[in-house]
Swiss-Prot record:
This is Membrane protein insertase YidC. One of its GO terms (molecular function) is membrane insertase activity. It is found in: Cell inner membrane. Belongs to the OXA1/ALB3/YidC family. Type 1 subfamily.
Length: 545
């Protein structure tokens, strides 16, 4: 019993250390970004490869990229501010206006897409006959230099045009909507030439591996990298190292590709009915591409055709992502314990709907979890109380048999059988709480809803550490009290080591998200009340007997 409890406590400390280490990776100071040249000057090697099964006379159009004649088109909605480069029609900068970088910088929005430093841009174009199709190095024309969603306006259309000078005109239109992070893209091919037009639409995300991604953790961690969804695999991570080791080549309907990071993502969603081909490429300087291209489209001379795709660039709002594409909500990555984490998230959302405060939602989720495990905890606490009652007899056995461990263990097990006490019963709450603890950790870390969410008084961001360490100190005190209610180990070395556990946990929890510490404090307080009551009842019954 003592050894098992000791091992469980050591394991829990190790688990806490690994979670703390990952929190430091996610929230700690990042290394200075290395200056990077503008992504528009990259070589044409970032274009998709010619499809291996395409037998037509098709080549990848490799118009030399240059900045000459290009300009930036600025687009503003109520939730997005972005820049589109006429060189390629790329989305080269995108700010999320409702998500400030930090509480200290409320007027500085998160910049999800950028072509500076660690570049992250969204690109699109066509694969087809040379000089007959535009790609993301081609020069497009725009009617205006700025587009803004006006009061009373719900839809904003941003058109760009390209012509081959031989009768083929392509119009790329970005369609943005009020309150939405979803951008529809329509590419209309108007073929007024004398020959049929053939091409494949592609859309891709080009990103430099962030400096922080070079730090490795041997435990589950917040993921930054590529993601693929197909009919066969609902959520497949394509890490930067996977892209570096080999190119992806997969076909599927109802698929999508994405680059995700903490709280936010950008994802291209091709038409669900098309069998798209999904690919990756590794470029120089740790720059990677993940994308998709469509089946070949043929536009006869004298006709036109519109090809569509959707780009989501914004926060990982699960209820929003569920309505865009199957499996897209999984980008809020709760890890291997998603089956537990999703109900916890649903409970949090439900209570937040009542209280409009994520702190109170966490407290009431804790109450629900405690209620679900009440009977289990009651049985465990009764076992621990009975163990505490047996403590004098165990000490007596220890003194009687001294260093003879075999005889001592035999006598101890005989005592347990005689008193009808389960020595393992007190360990069950710890085992049960570990997956719940991990699941809640990832819900708090991954859910953008809780990002910078205030609670009360000094707790103005439940996703970050307590600035004054009040909650971790309260948690340490609660652990100390709870430890006093438990039977101490008969082994003096283990007893001395376990005395330091509240202090060690307090140090670890100093740097944990305050929302997680809030859960642990409330859980400990409820456990103390329950355990104290059960112990008191057993002591009263013993006194009467």
């Amino acid at each position: 019993m003592d050894n098992l409890r000791f091992v469980l406590f050591v394991f829990f400390i190790f688990l806490s250390f690994l979670l703390w280490e990952q929190w430091q990776i996610d929230y700690g100071p990042k290394p200075q970004a290395v200056a990077q040249t503008d992504g528009a000057s990259r070589p044409a090697g970032d274009l998709p490869q010619r499809p291996s099964d395409d037998e037509s006379d098709v080549t990848v159009h490799t118009e030399a990229p240059t900045q000459e004649g290009s300009r930036r088109i600025r687009v503003h909605t109520d939730v997005l501010s972005l820049e589109i480069d006429t060189r390629g029609g790329d989305l080269r900068q995108l700010d999320l206006l409702n998500y400030p970088v930090s509480k200290e910088q409320p007027d500085r929005p998160v910049r999800l897409l950028t072509d500076q430093g660690d570049i992250f841009v969204a690109q699109s174009g066509f694969i087809g006959a040379a000089q007959q199709v535009p790609n993301h190095h081609s020069l497009w024309q725009a009617e205006a230099g700025e587009y803004r969603l006006q009061d009373g306006q719900d839809i904003l259309r941003v058109p760009l045009t390209w012509s081959d000078g031989q009768g083929v005109t392509v119009t790329k239109t970005y369609i943005l909507r009020r309150g939405s992070y979803l951008i529809d893209m329509e590419q209309t091919i108007d073929n007024r030439s004398n020959t049929n037009w053939t091409g494949r639409q592609y859309m891709q995300l080009q990103r430099k591996e962030p400096t922080s991604a070079q730090e490795d953790s041997q435990f589950i961690r917040t993921y930054t990298g590529g993601v693929l969804h197909t009919e066969d695999k609902s959520y497949e991570k394509i890490a930067f190292k996977d892209m570096a080791s080999g190119n992806l080549d997969a076909k599927s309907r109802q698929g999508w590709i994405a680059m995700i990071q903490h709280y936010f993502l950008a994802a291209w969603v091709p038409p669900a009915e098309d069998e798209s081909t999904f690919y990756t490429k590794a470029l120089a300087d740790r720059v990677f591409v993940i994308g998709a291209y469509s089946p070949p489209a043929e536009v006869p001379a004298g006709s036109s055709q519109t090809l569509k795709a959707r780009l989501f660039a914004g926060p990982k709002l699960q209820h929003v992502l569920e309505g865009i594409a199957p499996g897209l909500e999984l980008t809020a990555d709760f890890g291997i314990l998603t089956v537990i984490a999703k109900p916890i998230y649903w409970l949090l959302e439900t209570f937040h709907g009542f209280f409009n405060n994520w702190g109170w939602a966490i407290i009431f989720v804790t109450l629900v979890i405690k209620a679900l495990f009440f009977k289990l905890s009651e049985a465990s606490y009764r076992s621990m109380a009975n163990m505490r009652k047996l403590q004098p007899k165990l000490v007596e056995l220890k003194e009687r048999y001294g260093e003879d461990r075999q005889r001592y263990n035999q006598a101890m097990m005989e005592l347990y059988r005689k008193e009808k006490v389960n020595p393992l019963g007190g360990c069950l709450p710890i085992l049960v709480q570990i997956p719940v603890f991990i699941s809640l950790y990832w819900v708090l870390v991954e859910s953008v809803d809780l990002r910078q969410a205030p609670f009360l008084l000094w707790l103005d961001d439940l996703s970050s550490k307590d600035p004054y360490f009040v909650l971790p100190l309260i948690m340490g005190v609660s652990m100390f009290i709870q430890q006093r209610l438990n039977p101490p180990p008969t082994d003096p070395i283990q007893a001395r080591v376990m005395q330091f556990f509240p202090l060690v946990f307090t140090v670890f929890f100093l740097f944990f998200p305050s929302g997680l510490v809030l859960y642990w404090v409330v859980n400990n307080i409820l456990s103390i009340i329950q355990q104290w009551y059960i112990t008191r009842q057993i002591e009263k019954n013993t006194a009467r007997a």
